[in-house]
């Protein structure tokens, strides 16, 4: 018999030990299989059914590299449509490229940007045989809104001062534009010289403009306001050619005011077609109050046209002390009523006195505002 060295390993164990070892091995194998199944089920539940992959069967046998690590793919980024870009009324920059822009309007957002205030808005111009006439834009904007001067919009004591006669004297016009602050409104004469040049200078300086239209006075034609005078008879007959001739001499104004016209503004038959034409074109009417019988304000109210009336004339006298006294009276009216409107001419003494007084009045809390800021505008309500 061969010795123990030549016996197969494990054959010297009794049956009980062999059975226990077989049982233990079977148990371990079963446990491993169960663990594998559970782990696989869990992986499938978490990551989904793995997709079959075609491989070369010889590569599997030949490759000794460990299997690659499976990394969950990052989710694709969500592509959203670009949101609209909100532009405030004071913004002038265009929306970002590719964005959708819309404007959130505020009460002053229709006003021209100061950098382009000297340029007429093509949408507000009607071509005619007389030249460019002011007109409402197709979107409803009015010259009255677009060419309006800027002011703070805050409540307080406010005064509007209209200085007329610009364009007649070149030196006087240059002096007025250079001396008076932006809040002052300028009245241009249609019979003036270099009107487009002075209009641009005034608008660049921040001034609001009105056009002084010659209208029939008492005593006409012996008392003659000048070329293209709008008469009562013509207006009542529906002939507004003289008005159109004046309107075409300049652009970028918010409305018109009467030059003389004591008889005209007192005649409803003449004022009604005039005010209707202004309303159609989106302009205001300013009454200088030279006639106590004027029906301008009432007619404008009935036709929903912006209008304003002067409270007093500042410079009937060319004495600086008298001008100063009138300005002080204007301030008292404004403090009692909240607002006041004064009218003057572009004489050198008037301009110098008004400019000095405005500087002092601002120190007392008075705001000098454009004429349109104090006009009654039924359409805006």
Question: Whereabouts are the PLM-identified features?
Answer:
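Active-site beta->alpha N-cap acidic-glycine motif
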Residues: 139-223
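Juxtamembrane proline-rich low-complexity "stalk" or linker regions positioned immediately after a signal peptide
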Residues: 45-133
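N-terminal, positively charged topogenic segments adjacent to a membrane insertion site
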Residues: 1-25
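Hydrophobic faces of well-ordered beta-strands that scaffold small-molecule active sites
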Residues: 159-163, 184-188, 209-213, 256-258, ...
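C-terminal domain-boundary segment and adjacent tail
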Residues: 278-292, 346-381
